[in-house]
Amino acid sequence: MVKETHRFEPFTEEPIRLIGEEGEWLGDFPLDLEGEKLRRLYRDMLAARMLDERYTILIRTGKTSFIAPAAGHEAAQVAIAHAIRPGFDWVFPYYRDHGLALALGIPLKELFGQMLATKADPNKGRQMPEHPGSKALNFFTVASPIASHVPPAAGAAISMKLLRTGQVAVCTFGDGATSEGDWYAGINFAAVQGAPAVFVCENNFYAISVDYRHQTHSPTIADKAHAFGIPGYLVDGMDVLASYYVVKEAVERARRGEGPSLVELRVYRYGPHSSADDDSRYRPKEEVAFWRKKDPIPRFRRFLEARGLWNEEWEEDVREEIRAELERGLKEAEEAGPVPPEWMFADVFAEKPWHLLRQEALLKEEL
């Protein structure tokens, strides 16, 4: 449990970092997380990576039609999930956040059901893959248009303030979203209203193929917070503890009524932007290899090993548990069966109007 706040200064020139490349502790305060918590963070990162790998298998075997690889984002996404109160606070995610969804507690059956458009999908197969949502966990259904979820996140946070619920809205997005008008409008309004919101940029340096340095003249995305009059934090997003502590501090700051923050978590996506992208056309292999050496999972593994919290036997046990969970979740999603065609007419009106009833009848005749 985090015992203090205000540990970090905003607008630093270098990313905030707590774990060194060899796993050494760099913090100027004592680590106050218990061993089981640290192990859970690592397990969730492994699960996120293994889920990402399973999604790749789904696309290559023709079982789904689209994926947005997130390998390299694990530390950032798991940290966000652990920094909030699941099922109480709200999350407004973006399309690469399946690791965040899993760490938050969305069942694998639902995640796979959404990817396969089976009856296991709470959205009833109406969204394209990589667009999960969870009413139970206050996980806003992913929206495709870039940054379009930022104004709703601001609005939700304002309502939380007016109703004095004590909740916080956390909104995530990629670096490309920061070039959209909705992004500026949403954060500006949240700042003006002093809303309990935390806006988190998972900056992987590319908006599909466009280098973020070609999108903005601002030295960092965190620096954009100056325009809104809110604090902006630049963080090594491949450092799970730095990401956790900074996001946690921003969340609790918002919960105390001190307004929103902007957090830039610098990460690197190891795969293409999506299954429809060839990243070799715009990223040199040497660049990818450089960032591979900074993989957040081995880095945190070294940190745990130095504290006697990791060994190869424990790692294999954890991997086997995750493999079994993935197999079970996928099996349950597939066995749920495809969504029936008539579901497309449900949940549109409280009472179906005549024209929908007529269309439904015509469809049944054709089938």
From Swiss-Prot:
Enzyme class name: oxidoreductase
Catalytic activity, EC: 1.2.4.4
SUPFAM superfamilies: Thiamin diphosphate-binding fold (THDP-binding)
Record-listed Mg(2+) binding positions: 175, 204, 206
Pfam families according to UniProt: E1_dh
Keyword Metal-binding: yes
Gene Ontology molecular functions: 3-methyl-2-oxobutanoate dehydrogenase (2-methylpropanoyl-transferring) activity; metal ion binding
InterPro entries: Alpha-ketoacid_DH_E1_comp (IPR050771), DH_E1 (IPR001017), THDP-binding (IPR029061)
Gene Ontology biological process terms, A to Z: branched-chain amino acid catabolic process
Binding-site residues, substrate: 66, 95, 128-131, 144
Residue positions binding thiamine diphosphate: 94-96, 144-146, 174-180, 204-208, 273
Reaction it catalyzes: N(6)-[(R)-lipoyl]-L-lysyl-[protein] + 3-methyl-2-oxobutanoate + H(+) = N(6)-[(R)-S(8)-2-methylpropanoyldihydrolipoyl]-L-lysyl-[protein] + CO2
Gene3D superfamilies on file: 3.40.50.970
Co-factor requirement: thiamine diphosphate
Keyword terms of this UniProt record: Magnesium, Metal-binding, Oxidoreductase, Thiamine pyrophosphate
Subunit structure and binding partners: Heterotetramer of two alpha and two beta chains. Directly associated with ODBB in the E1 complex.
Recorded family membership: Belongs to the BCKDHA family.
Role of this protein: The branched-chain alpha-keto dehydrogenase complex catalyzes the overall conversion of alpha-keto acids to acyl-CoA and CO(2). It contains multiple copies of three enzymatic components: branched-chain alpha-keto acid decarboxylase (E1), lipoamide acyltransferase (E2) and lipoamide dehydrogenase (E3).
Protein name (database record): 2-oxoisovalerate dehydrogenase subunit alpha
Organism field: Thermus thermophilus (strain ATCC BAA-163 / DSM 7039 / HB27)
